[in-house]
């Protein structure tokens, strides 16, 4: 009795704990979303998820438990079974008592069948049949359980998880093969099957409960697909096979596939569970015989079988549309075999499945125990399975190998063209402006001076060496860290931009110069990394009350070098002359770049939650041998206030010291979810986000509140899909992507705003309809921030990867892969690696002004010469435009690998690099940049020197290559001067004829 009460109290305690935990999560989320201004977004998602879970779990539970309860009523009672079988056994001879004996005749079977009963099953048939059905039940549980676990522990956005293939007749074998190839799953499924055979009633009901939770979970996490279905936006473009608008495949088909996944599993398990209930009734296994299905049992199974066949027909109806994702042919999407053979087969299977389903349901409604057409059901199902196997799998394979492959190009030409066209549409490649670029090799010193802005922005400092230098010179304390350095451009007053001449022989500046100039810079945030705090100092107060924020940033021009080969800084240090402000290189920089009080409460590595406005002052920044302290006065955070809120957040954060600390005040706030990625992920989980948030120093008013705070994070967000018809997916399974959203996060206040960057994207239009007011037009972004938007690296990388194949628009060239491209390699440090896209300020060919672009060169497959380069524009009206410059194929244009080889083969350069590498240091070859200037290409590579003991990279040399000339000098200016200096032609020798026989005297 005592233990029973202990068990009950434990159950009550666990239930109360779960209830409190759920309530605290819900309450904290409501407070947090209200703080960031997106409470309506959260509530709509919450209601949608809750309704979907309740509907899916409830319908599944009612259907499965209801049918299992009905089966319990209709199954053979134990007493009837024992009496009948034992009476018949008593009449048998001793030699016939073994039901497995081949001498046992059917005439000796139990006489309990009336005219409506089906024939009995003996043990040699009953046991394998029951075991196979039990294995199927275990396979269903494991399969759908794996899907649910994939949603619980995703590696990417939950809403973007693909719908895994449901239980279709032709795929059960493949699913079984995959699962049974793994010993763990094999043992689990066999164990479930044996448990069902022994304790059928308990385990069949338990599996029904688990599947109800699983199906509820699957629909819970697919709330985005459901909402998109009800708010579709037309693409105004049709796919060629069925003539449907693309929106059907993006918004409608995923929901139908989700329903198929759910209902197919529910109906299939229900049919299997009820069949097992009947087969295992009356202790049939221990008695060695099943008396046969009674008329009531048959009627029940007919009804459930009819629903199952209805889903099978629906599955084949969906399979027709899924042919546009077929990988069978030479190109992605429906191929010749799919259209000519597979599509008619799916149509036939759909119609036959409907016919069988309607017949079974008609027999269920208008039941007759004695029917002369009863055997037609088995014939029909047998014929259906034959068509599925023979026509659904064998026939398409025969056609593919015997008809298509011998004449593949002729058969597949139309379908290849579809793949090319729709892949280019899906990845935004059809709008690329392709031009011819024919390098002339006539670049002169005058041309270099005419392109002074381009030269002044050639990037000599890469992110890696600059970050290493920052960590040595600008961190100041162990708990500060520079997690990243980002390329951007700023408009500076001319005084700030004119610290260094572009070349040694540059003419003096004219009397009238431009008031401002754009400079390419590397900006890095100085964030607080609490994990770097000494272990002895990692106390609760330090973690949550004192070490709350980072401070400041560094800004370095990309092309200038300070004393000793170290980078120069426009902005650096902490605690300048203006009470905690940062140090600047000049007044012009201070006037050009707003600094204010650059506290970073929200950043890339701010992963701890903190409490502000307490009795404990926050560490602001180090000042000499002491520290400066401050209290947060921003708009972020949630007021803890009363005791119940303190308890709520203590429960939510699992931080019980919050309940007992005496440092809280009535105005104390809690700031959590401070990492910018997790912050925007929580608000908009239906978007994908760029991997590189970048810091911007600008005046964001009036869109962002807050005085004297000018630091913002900008993040690019993408709308993606894997359901675009005929579009060949990339390595991540994405076959549609748009950079539709720009996100701005206030680094001090935590405010988040979403701006639509591509209003032509139907997916973002759908999300705008679902969440009205969440997205703002890009024109609402402050101009000071808008001037810093850039073409995102991740988006450009995906497009450039697809372009390597899908620049070929001719079907025969595409089929033969005659013009396949690749991304060239470069040497970085001492290792070869693919060239990464890089930003630069330059003027594109035929464009009369400089602009901020993202560039990537291409080489032909398995060759090293340049074949093209892709440029993405980032400024003003030209933002988002792609330009592809193709080089003449009949002319050699040096690629990065060829230039690297020439650098390493040059005796002077290679000797110097080898000398550095032998003196306790290491020479690092930086990024090799291919820079278009007018109608020529200039190659620039910095060389850094790094000590093996102390990693402080310094820029020691710059290598410049142009045409057949290559120069290594201490500065870019010297290298340019050397490579473009006029070649001195020696004076011809004076040759006089010497006449034989003459002498000076003569």
Swiss-Prot record:
Q: Where are the transmembrane segments?
A: 7-29, 49-71, 123-145, 178-200, 202-224, 258-280, 300-319, 339-361, 382-404
Q: Where does this chain mainly localize?
A: membrane
The record, for Pfam families, names: UPF0182
How does the UniProt record describe the way this protein sits in the membrane? Multi-pass membrane protein
The UniProt entry's coiled-coil ranges are none
Which Gene Ontology cellular component annotation is one that this UniProt entry carries?
plasma membrane
Asked whether the keyword Transferase is assigned, the reply is: no
What keywords does the record list, in alphabetical order? Cell membrane, Membrane, Transmembrane, Transmembrane helix
Compartment(s) where it occurs, according to its Swiss-Prot or TrEMBL record: Cell membrane
Q: Which NCBIfam families does the entry link to?
A: PRK02509.1 (NF002707)
Query: What family is this?
Result: Belongs to the UPF0182 family.
Q: What is this protein called?
A: UPF0182 protein alr1037
Organism equals Nostoc sp. (strain PCC 7120 / SAG 25.82 / UTEX 2576)
């Amino acid at each position: 009795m005592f233990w029973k009460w202990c068990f009950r109290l434990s159950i009550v305690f666990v239930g109360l704990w779960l209830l409190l935990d759920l309530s605290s999560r819900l309450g904290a989320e409501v407070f947090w979303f209200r703080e960031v201004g997106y409470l309506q977004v959260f509530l709509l998602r919450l209601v949608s998820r809750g309704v979907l879970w309740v509907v899916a779990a409830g319908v599944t539970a009612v259907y499965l438990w209801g049918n299992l309860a009905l089966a319990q009523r209709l199954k053979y009672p134990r007493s009837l079974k024992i009496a009948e079988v034992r009476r018949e056994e008593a009449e048998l001879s001793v030699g016939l008592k073994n039901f497995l004996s081949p001498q046992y005749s059917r005439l000796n079977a139990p006489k309990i069948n009336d005219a409506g009963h089906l024939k009995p099953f003996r043990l040699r048939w009953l046991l394998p049949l029951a075991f196979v059905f039990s294995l199927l039940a275990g396979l269903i549980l494991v399969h759908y359980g794996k899907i649910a676990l994939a949603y619980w522990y995703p590696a990417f956005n939950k809403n973007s998880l693909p719908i895994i293939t449901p239980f279709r007749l032709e795929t059960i074998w493949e699913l079984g093969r995959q699962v049974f190839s793994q010993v763990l799953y094999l043992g689990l499924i066999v164990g479930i099957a044996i448990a069902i055979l022994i304790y059928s009633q308990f385990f069949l009901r338990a599996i029904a409960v688990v599947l109800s939770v699983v199906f509820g979970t699957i629909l819970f996490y697919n709330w985005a697909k459901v909402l998109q279905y009800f708010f579709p936006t037309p693409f105004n473009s049709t796919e060629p096979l069925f003539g449907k608008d693309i929106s059907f495949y993006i918004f409608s088909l995923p929901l139908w596939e989700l329903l198929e996944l759910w209902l197919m599993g529910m109906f299939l398990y229900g049919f299997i569970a009820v069949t097992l209930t009947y087969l295992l009734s009356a202790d049939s296994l221990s008695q060695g015989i099943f008396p046969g299905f009674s008329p009531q049992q048959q009627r029940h199974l007919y009804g459930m079988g009819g629903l199952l066949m209805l889903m099978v027909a629906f599955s084949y109806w969906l399979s027709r549309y899924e042919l546009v994702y077929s990988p069978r042919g030479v190109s992605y999407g429906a191929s010749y075999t799919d259209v000519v053979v597979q599509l008619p087969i799916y149509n036939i299977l759909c119609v036959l499945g409907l016919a069988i389903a309607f017949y079974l349901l008609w027999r269920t409604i208008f039941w007759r125990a004695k029917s002369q057409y009863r055997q037609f059901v088995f014939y029909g199902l047998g014929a259906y399975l034959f068509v599925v196997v023979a026509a659904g799998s064998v026939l398409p394979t025969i056609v593919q190998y015997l008809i298509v492959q011998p004449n593949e190009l002729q058969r597949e030409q139309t379908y290849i063209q579809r793949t090319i066209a729709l892949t280019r549409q899906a990845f935004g490649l059809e709008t690329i402006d392709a031009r011819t670029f024919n390098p002339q090799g006539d670049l002169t010193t005058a041309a270099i001076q005419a392109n002074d802005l381009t030269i002044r922005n050639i990037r000599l400092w890469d992110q890696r060496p600059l970050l290493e230098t920052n960590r040595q010179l600008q961190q100041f304390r162990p708990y500060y860290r520079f997690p990243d350095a980002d390329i951007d451009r700023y408009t500076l007053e001319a005084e700030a931009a004119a610290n260094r001449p572009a070349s040694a022989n540059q003419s003096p500046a004219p009397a009238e110069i431009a008031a401002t100039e754009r400079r390419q810079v590397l900006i890095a945030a100085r964030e607080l990394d609490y994990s770097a705090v000494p272990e002895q100092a990692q106390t609760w107060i330090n973690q949550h009350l004192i070490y709350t924020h980072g401070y400041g940033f560094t800004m370095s021009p990309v092309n200038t070098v300070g004393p000793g080969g170290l980078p120069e800084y426009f902005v650096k240090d902490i605690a300048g002359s203006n009470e905690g402000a940062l140090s600047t290189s000049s007044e012009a920089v201070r006037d050009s770049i707003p600094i204010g009080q650059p506290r970073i409460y929200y950043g890339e590595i701010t992963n701890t939650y903190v409490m502000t406005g307490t009795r404990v002052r926050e560490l602001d920044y180090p000042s000499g041998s002491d520290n400066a302290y401050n209290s947060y006065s921003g708009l972020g955070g949630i007021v803890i206030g009363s005791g119940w809120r303190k308890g709520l957040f203590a429960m939510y954060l699992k931080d019980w010291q919050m309940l007992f600390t005496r440092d809280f005040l009535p105005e104390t706030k809690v700031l959590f979810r401070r990492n910018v990625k997790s912050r925007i992920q929580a608000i908009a989980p239906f978007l994908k986000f760029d991997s590189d948030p970048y810091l911007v120093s600008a005046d964001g008013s009036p869109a962002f509140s807050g005085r004297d705070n000018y630091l913002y994070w900008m993040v690019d967000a993408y709308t993606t899909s894997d359901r675009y018809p005929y579009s060949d997916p990339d390595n991540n399974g994405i076959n549609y992507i748009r950079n539709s959203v720009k996100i701005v996060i206030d680094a001090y206040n935590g405010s988040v705003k979403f701006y639509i960057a591509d209003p032509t994207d139907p997916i973002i239009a759908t999300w705008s309809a679902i969440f009205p007011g969440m997205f703002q037009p890009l024109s609402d972004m402050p101009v000071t921030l808008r001037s810093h938007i850039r073409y995102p690296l991740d988006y450009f990388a995906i497009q450039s990867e697809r372009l390597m194949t899908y620049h070929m628009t001719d079907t025969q060239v595409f089929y033969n892969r005659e013009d396949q491209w690749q991304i060239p390699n470069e040497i970085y440090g001492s290792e070869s690696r693919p060239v990464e896209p890089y930003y630069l300020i330059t003027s594109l060919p035929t464009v009369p002004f400089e602009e901020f672009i993202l560039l990537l060169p291409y080489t032909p497959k398995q060759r090293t010469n340049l074949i093209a380069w892709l440029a993405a524009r980032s400024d003003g009206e030209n933002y988002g435009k792609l330009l592809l410059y193709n080089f003449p194929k009949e002319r050699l244009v040096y690629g990065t690998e060829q230039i690297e080889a020439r650098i390493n083969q040059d005796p002077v350069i290679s000797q110097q690099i080898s000398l550095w590498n032998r003196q306790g240091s290491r020479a690092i070859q930086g990024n090799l940049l291919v820079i278009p200037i007018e109608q020529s290409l200039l190659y620039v590579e910095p060389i850094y020197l790094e000590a093996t003991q102390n990693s402080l990279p310094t820029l020691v040399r710059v290598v410049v290559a142009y045409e057949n000339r290559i120069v290594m000098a201490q500065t870019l200016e010297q290298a340019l001067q050397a490579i473009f200096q006029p070649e001195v032609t020696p004076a011809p020798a004076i040759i006089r004829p010497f006449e034989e026989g003459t002498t000076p005297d003569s």
